[in-house]
C-alpha cells in the first residue's frame, strides 16, 4: 500500500484509479467489515477530489449518513462538513468511506456497532479494538491509506495497537471537535490512524489548528510538524515502570527490549511511577458517562434519526424511541451517568472524580516538567478473541493505560514495536506535554525507525 506522502504526488487521474482500486478491494474483503458500506453492499462514500482518507461514522461529512453506528440515528444525513473535513479538503484530501465503530464510541472492541462487528485484519478471530476499530482495520487491512477516528479514552491508540498501525491522539483542543458527534465533550479528541509516523504528522498538520466554531479549541499558534520532523533528536524519556511491569508478560518483555533499544540509540531513560490505574478508571467512567448522559439526551425522537412507531403520547415517544434505538452498552452508560449526576450522589461521585482528574493531570505535568516524553504500554494484552466472555468492568480495563492521557488532556501516540508468539501486534505509547506534538512525533519517528532497522 502506498503511503499518504506518496499519494500526495499523484495526478488527478491516478487518484481516481486509486479510489477505484480501494473500492474494489473493500468489496472483496467485505467480511472484515471495516467500512459501513461493506455491511450495506454499497460503494464507498466519496466527497470531493484528492487523496482518499477514511472517516469514522461520528464525524460529519455533508450529504453522508451519520449514525455513530447506532440504530437511533439511522437515516440522519449530515447537513454540513465538520471543521476537520473542511481542513482535509483544503489540504488535498478527500473523505472516502465510512468506518465502522462501537455505538456512540462507547466500547473497546467495535462489537457494539448496530451494523455488525469489524474483524482484526491480523487475525479474524480477534477484535480490532475500539471504538475506532473500523478506522484501524481499514488502514491495517490495506483498505485505506489513512483514516480519521476519535479518542475519548484510547479509541484511536488502542485499536491501532491491536491492528498494528500508528494511532495518534493530539492534545485536547488542538483539533476542532465541531462536527464530531459528542460522547464526552471534555475528553473527546479527533485523531489519525496511519501506516507510519510521517503520514500521521502529514494528516495531523492537515486537520489541526484553532477553530472559532469550537469553544474548546486551543487558540494558540500552530506550527506544522511534518516539515520539521527530526529523527535524530535525543530525548529524555520517563518510563512508567509500574505500568510496564503490570502488563502481560509478552507485552512487558517486548517493551523492555524497546527501552533497551532507546537507550542504545542515545535517548536518556529515567524510571517513574504513576498512580494506581484504578483511580484513572473510576474518574474516567464517572466523568465520561456523566457527560454522555447529557450529550445523548438530544436523541429523543423529535430532532434526529429514527422515531419509534409504537407511540400513543409524548412520554411513549421518548421512552420507546430511546429504548429501541440505543444498544445495551449505551444504555448502561447513560444510566450510570444519570446516577452520578443525581442530587444525592453528585458530590460523592462527580465532584470527587473531577478532583481526581486534577490530581492525575498534576502528576503527569510533574513528570513532564523534567522529561520530554513518557513511555508506557498502550494495552495490557494483545488483541483478545471475540468469544472471550468479558464483564463490562473487564472490558473497561482494556483502556487502563490510555484513559489517563485524555483526563490530563495530553497528546499520545501508539507505535508498533513487536509481535507476540501468535503474530499479534504489540505497541508502545509515547505521551507529550500539552501542545508539544512536535517532540512527540520526533520521538515516535525515532522509535519507528529504530524498530524497522
From Swiss-Prot:
Annotated protein name in UniProt: Glutamyl-tRNA(Gln) amidotransferase subunit A
Gene3D superfamilies reported in the protein's UniProt record: Amidase signature (AS) domain (3.90.1300.10)
Keyword tRNA processing: no
Active site: 56 (charge relay system), 131 (charge relay system), 155 (acyl-ester intermediate)
Any GO BP annotation: translation
Keywords: ATP-binding, Ligase, Nucleotide-binding, Protein biosynthesis
Gene label: gatA
Presence of the UniProt keyword Nucleotide-binding in the record: yes
Protein purpose: Allows the formation of correctly charged Gln-tRNA(Gln) through the transamidation of misacylated Glu-tRNA(Gln) in organisms which lack glutaminyl-tRNA synthetase. The reaction takes place in the presence of glutamine and ATP through an activated gamma-phospho-Glu-tRNA(Gln).
EC assignment: 6.3.5.7
Subunit structure: Heterotrimer of A, B and C subunits.
Family: Belongs to the amidase family. GatA subfamily.
GO molecular function: ATP binding; glutaminyl-tRNA synthase (glutamine-hydrolyzing) activity
GO CC terms in record: glutamyl-tRNA(Gln) amidotransferase complex
Protein's organism: Campylobacter jejuni subsp. jejuni serotype O:6 (strain 81116 / NCTC 11828)
Pfam family, one: Amidase
InterPro entries: Amidase, Amidase_CS, Amidase_dom, AS_sf, GatA
Amino acid at each position: 500500500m502506498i503511503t499518504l506522502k506518496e499519494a500526495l504526488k499523484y495526478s488527478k487521474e491516478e487518484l481516481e484509479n486509486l479510489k477505484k482500486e480501494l473500492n474494489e478491494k473493500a468489496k472483496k474483503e467485505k467480511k472484515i467489515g471495516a467500512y459501513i458500506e461493506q455491511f450495506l453492499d454499497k460503494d464507498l462514500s466519496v466527497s470531493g477530489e484528492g487523496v482518499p482518507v477514511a472517516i469514522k461514522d461520528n464525524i460529519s461529512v455533508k450529504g453522508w449518513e451519520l449514525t455513530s453506528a447506532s440504530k437511533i440515528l439511522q437515516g440522519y444525513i449530515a447537513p454540513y462538513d465538520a471543521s476537520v473535513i473542511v481542513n482535509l479538503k483544503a489540504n488535498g484530501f478527500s473523505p472516502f468511506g465510512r468506518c465502522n465503530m462501537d455505538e456512540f464510541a462507547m466500547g473497546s472492541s467495535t462489537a457494539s456497532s448496530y451494523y455488525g462487528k469489524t474483524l482484526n485484519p491480523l487475525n479474524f478471530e480477534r477484535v480490532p479494538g475500539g471504538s475506532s476499530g473500523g478506522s484501524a482495520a481499514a488502514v491495517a487491512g490495506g483498505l485505506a491509506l489513512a483514516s480519521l477516528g476519535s479518542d475519548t479514552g484510547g479509541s484511536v491508540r488502542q485499536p491501532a495497537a491491536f491492528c498494528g498501525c500508528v494511532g495518534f491522539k493530539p492534545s485536547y483542543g488542538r483539533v476542532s471537535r465541531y462536527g464530531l458527534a459528542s460522547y464526552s465533550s471534555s475528553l473527546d479528541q479527533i485523531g489519525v490512524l496511519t501506516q507510519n509516523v510521517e503520514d500521521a504528522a502529514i494528516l495531523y498538520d492537515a486537520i489541526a489548528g484553532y477553530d472559532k466554531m469550537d469553544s474548546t479549541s486551543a487558540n494558540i499558534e500552530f506550527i506544522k510538524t511534518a516539515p520539521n520532523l527530526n529523527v535524530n533528536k535525543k530525548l529524555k524519556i520517563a518510563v512508567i515502570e509500574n505500568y510496564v511491569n503490570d502488563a502481560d508478560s509478552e507485552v512487558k518483555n517486548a517493551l523492555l527490549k524497546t527501552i533497551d533499544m532507546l537507550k542504545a540509540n542515545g535517548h536518556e531513560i529515567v524510571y517513574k511511577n504513576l498512580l494506581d490505574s484504578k483511580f484513572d478508571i473510576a474518574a474516567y467512567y464517572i466523568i465520561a458517562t456523566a457527560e454522555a448522559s447529557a450529550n445523548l439526551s438530544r436523541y429523543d425522537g423529535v430532532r434526529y434519526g429514527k422515531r419509534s412507531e409504537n407511540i400513543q403520547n409524548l412520554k411513549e415517544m421518548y421512552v420507546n424511541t430511546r429504548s429501541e434505538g440505543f444498544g445495551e452498552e449505551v444504555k448502561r452508560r447513560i444510566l450510570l451517568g444519570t446516577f452520578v449526576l443525581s442530587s444525592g450522589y453528585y458530590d460523592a461521585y462527580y465532584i470527587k472524580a473531577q478532583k481526581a482528574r486534577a490530581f492525575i493531570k498534576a502528576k503527569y505535568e510533574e513528570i513532564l516538567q523534567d522529561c520530554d516524553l513518557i513511555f508506557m504500554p498502550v494495552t495490557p494484552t494483545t488483541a483478545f478473541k471475540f468469544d472471550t466472555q468479558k464483564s463490562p468492568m473487564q472490558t473497561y480495563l482494556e483502556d487502563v493505560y490510555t484513559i489517563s492521557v485524555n483526563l490530563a488532556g495530553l497528546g499520545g501516540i501508539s507505535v508498533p514495536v513487536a509481535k507476540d508468539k501468535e503474530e499479534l501486534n504489540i505497541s508502545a505509547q509515547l505521551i507529550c506535554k500539552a501542545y508539544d506534538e512536535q517532540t512527540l512525533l520526533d520521538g515516535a519517528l525515532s522509535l519507528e525507525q529504530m524498530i524497522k532497522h
